[in-house]
Amino acid sequence: LMVKILLMKHGTLNEYLIGKVTELDEEPSILVEGCYKIVDGKLETYPKYSSQRDLFLTSDAVFTIVDPSTEILGEYQKVNE
């Protein structure tokens, strides 16, 4: 599975999630495994108040999906060792 960054649509397009992304044929069409939120270059648990790290998202909630930078990928790999 490829680690990707998801830029979420709601708000001011400044909410970034990172995880292993699988695109599915039906809604909810995006599975994010090992999901974290990126805040100021650091990873925070997401969603808060839950130990669940795997999420299903609908395609209309996501603005775009991009590859992570080397630095943030390194941070992600550290928390998922």
Predicted features and spans:
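Conserved RNA-binding domains used in RNP assembly and mRNA/RNA metabolism
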Residues: 1-81
